[in-house]
């Protein structure tokens, strides 16, 4: 992967904390939902309820598509990422604790709220590993996309 593109991807991942992730429902229809995420390099983590539709969908098929972007008043300032990726349940307790710590770092305001953080036993934590990343940057031209295979 080109180092300039890698830096751009990491910058976009680091400056955002919400993504839209699409999983496949049992009937074959995609289901897109918004989730908070944290990343360590190109690896993303998110959590959901253990009995959620996302968790059930991913238990059947670990393929996901996701987008990370933001609203902008100028069309030519649109930037973002879309990915084809695999999402696996984090089963290692050390990695699960790390993922929860990373998520808390994305939401520092949460520390002042007197609600307990969920434990790995309370939620399903997923590790998202990108296979293909599309880097959208309209400042390089309308609809400009750099495609990266991981």
PLM segments and residue spans:
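Extreme N-terminal tail/first-helix region
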Residues: 1-18, 146-147
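Charged, gly/pro-rich active-site loop segments
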Residues: 75-150
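Short Pro/Gly-enriched beta-strand edge/turn motifs at strand-loop
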Residues: 15-20, 107-110
């Amino acid at each position: 992967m080109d180092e300039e593109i890698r830096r751009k991807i990491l910058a976009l991942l680091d400056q955002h904390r919400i993504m839209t992730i699409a999983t496949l429902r049992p009937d074959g229809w995609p289901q897109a939902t918004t989730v908070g995420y944290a990343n360590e390099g190109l690896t993303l983590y998110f959590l959901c309820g253990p009995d959620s539709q996302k968790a059930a969908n991913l238990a059947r098929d670990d393929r996901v598509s996701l987008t990370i972007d933001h609203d902008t008043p100028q069309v030519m300032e649109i930037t973002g990422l879309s990915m084809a990726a695999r999402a696996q349940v984090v089963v290692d307790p050390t990695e699960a604790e790390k993922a929860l710590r990373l998520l808390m770092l994305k939401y520092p305001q949460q520390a002042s709220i007197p609600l307990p953080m969920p434990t790995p036993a309370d939620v399903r934590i997923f590790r998202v590993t990108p296979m293909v990343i599309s880097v959208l940057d309209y400042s390089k031209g309308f609809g400009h996309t750099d495609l990266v295979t991981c």
